[in-house]
């Protein structure tokens, strides 16, 4: 019988730059998941890693640039927050979430326990900025205001793969166990209403399964077999993380079969040139298809 277990580690202590995160994880695992075992996948929310690495910002201490002031006027976003977005990466797209909520309010009302609170948070964040951070599109560039004190926010770790590697090394020193570490962050889904946790950093696990073209049950090469394992374990851990006051920022996934690797999430991202070529080819092929569709009506 194949089985995978997920243990959520509840952490009630305040976490800051003085916290020894690997030791804290090991101590909590002893009490809540029978310790750390070989081949465990330790999934950690990015917010916790950001707090330890000093990536929490006090908004009134940020000096906005002229560019940030300029954009903030058009997008009703505090210039300090706008400055952080611009620092994190290049803004690729802007989603007018408040306008969409005004037009399709029933979608938001169906998935909230407090209509008043939902309206308040949308007023505070009327636009979602999709920002290219190391070849990955992240909402607001990973800048997050939740579970931070008023007037504060957190940015994702500067180098999530390196953060995952360091934590993995420290866990190995403390326990003698070989594990994998994945750092997860919450992202809005663009194809349906809702959010899901995705991996922004990893160490010790092959991020993408290497089975493209492998034979299926009928012996035919399959167009597929490239599961995004780090995203899958992040989404699985999110079942226990929650999004509000669960105080469960770490999960241990046990029993998962995976290929060990020193590669990280950044290694699995599409190169920028591939992005540009894909868009160009997409546009050209769609123009071609539209023209052929018109011609097919003539013949």
Where are these regions (language model features)?
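N-terminal and secondary-structure boundary signal
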Residues: 1-299
């Amino acid at each position: 019988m194949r089985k995978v277990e997920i243990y959520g580690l509840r952490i009630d202590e305040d976490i800051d730059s003085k916290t020894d995160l690997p030791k804290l994880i090991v101590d909590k695992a002893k009490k809540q998941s029978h310790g750390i075992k070989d081949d465990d996948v330790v999934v950690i929310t990015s917010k916790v890693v950001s707090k330890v690495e000093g990536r929490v910002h006090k908004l009134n201490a940020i000096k906005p640039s002229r560019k940030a002031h300029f954009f903030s006027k058009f997008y009703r976003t505090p210039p300090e927050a706008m400055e952080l977005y611009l620092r994190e990466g290049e803004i690729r797209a802007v989603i007018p979430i408040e306008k969409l909520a005004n037009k399709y309010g029933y979608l938001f009302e169906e998935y909230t326990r407090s209509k008043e609170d939902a309206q308040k948070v949308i007023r505070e964040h009327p636009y979602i900025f999709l920002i290219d951070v190391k070849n990955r599109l992240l909402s607001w560039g990973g800048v997050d205001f939740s579970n931070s004190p008023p007037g504060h926010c957190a940015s994702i770790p500067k180098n999530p793969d390196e953060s995952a590697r360091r934590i993995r090394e420290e866990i190995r020193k403390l326990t003698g166990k070989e594990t994998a570490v994945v750092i997860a962050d919450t992202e809005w889904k663009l194809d349906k209403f809702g959010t899901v946790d995705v991996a922004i950093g990893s160490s010790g696990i092959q991020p993408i399964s290497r089975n493209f073209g492998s034979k299926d049950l009928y012996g035919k090469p399959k167009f597929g077999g490239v599961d995004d394992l780090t995203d899958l374990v992040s989404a699985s851990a999110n079942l226990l993380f929650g999004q509000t006051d669960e105080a469960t920022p770490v999960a241990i996934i046990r029993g998962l079969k995976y290929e060990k690797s020193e590669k990280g999430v950044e290694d699995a991202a599409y190169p920028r040139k591939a992005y540009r070529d894909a868009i160009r080819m997409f546009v050209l092929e769609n123009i071609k298809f539209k023209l052929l569709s018109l011609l097919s009506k003539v013949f």
